[in-house]
Regions:
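Short His-Asn-centered micro-motif
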Residues: 6-8, 31, 77-81, 101-102, ...
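PAPS-dependent sulfotransferase catalytic core
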Residues: 1-60, 133-142, 192-216
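PAPS-dependent sulfotransferase catalytic domain
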Residues: 87, 109-173, 179
Length: 216
C-alpha cells in the first residue's frame, strides 16, 4: 500500500484518486469499487466490528478486500475506507497519508446535502447490500441526522486522521481542491507532470445532481 487518502466524501477524493493513477500509483480503491467488486458485505462487517463491538480490523482483515486475489491495491480513497483512519494507518504503516479537506466547511456540508444524503434517502433498493452498507455509515457516522451532526463529524474525523498520523510519526499532507500537482508530487517524491497536463476534475455525482435539478 503506497497511499491512504483519508478525507471524507465531497473533498476531492475522486479527482485525487485519478491524479494518483496518472502518477503511476494504480490501482486506487475508491467508493465505486465497492459495488463493482461486491465488497459491500465485507465493509458492512468492518463497520459493525468498529462500532458495535469486536476486534478492530488489521492488515489481514483489510486485505480480504484490498488484497483480493493476492494483488494489493496501491492506494485507497473515500468512503467506506475513510471511516477507518486509525485502523488503516496501523495496518499499512508504509503508506503515505493524505487528508483531503475543503477550504470552506459549510460548502462541504452543502455539497453532502445535495448529493450523498438525498441519494441515500431516495434509494429504492433498500434490500440491496449497498443500501445496507450506506445505512450503517449513516447510522454510525452522523446518527442518521446529517443536518445536525454532519459538521461535527467533519471536524472530528479530520482531527482523528491528524492524531492517528502523529501517533505513528507519519508525515501528513492536507490537500485542498485546487492545489494542483505541485504539493502532491513534492509530498510523494514524484516528478510533476508537464505544464500542459491538467489536474483531473472528476465527480461521480454530477449525473445525480443533474437529475435532481431536472425534477425540481
Amino acid at each position: 500500500m503506497k497511499v491512504l487518502v483519508l478525507g471524507l466524501p465531497r473533498t476531492g477524493t475522486q479527482s485525487l484518486a485519478e491524479a494518483l493513477e496518472q502518477l503511476g500509483i494504480s490501482p486506487i480503491y475508491h467508493m465505486r469499487e465497492v459495488g463493482k467488486n461486491q465488497h459491500a458485505l465485507l465493509w458492512t462487517e468492518a463497520i459493525e466490528t468498529k462500532f458495535e463491538g469486536g476486534v478492530p480490523w488489521g492488515c489481514e482483515e483489510f486485505d480480504r478486500i484490498l488484497g483480493e486475489g493476492g494483488v494489493r491495491e496501491k492506494g485507497l480513497a473515500d468512503y467506506p475506507a475513510a471511516i477507518f483512519p486509525e485502523e488503516l494507518i496501523e495496518a499499512y504503516p508504509e503508506a503515505a497519508v493524505i487528508l483531503t479537506v475543503r477550504e470552506d466547511e459549510q460548502k462541504w456540508h452543502d455539497s453532502m446535502m445535495s448529493t450523498l444524503i438525498p441519494a441515500h434517502a431516495q434509494n429504492d433498493h433498500r434490500s440491496s447490500d449497498m443500501y445496507r452498507l450506506a445505512a450503517k455509515y449513516h447510522q454510525h457516522c452522523w446518527s442518521n441526522d446529517f443536518p445536525t451532526h454532519g459538521m461535527a463529524l467533519y471536524q472530528k474525523h479530520n482531527q482523528a486522521v491528524r492524531d492517528a498520523a502523529a501517533r505513528r510519526a507519519k508525515k501528513l499532507l492536507e490537500y485542498k481542491p485546487g492545489m494542483g500537482w505541485a504539493p502532491l508530487c513534492e509530498f510523494l517524491g514524484l516528478p510533476t507532470p508537464a505544464a500542459d497536463v491538467p489536474y483531473p476534475r472528476a465527480d461521480d455525482w454530477l449525473d445525480f445532481k443533474q437529475k435532481r435539478t431536472e425534477k425540481a
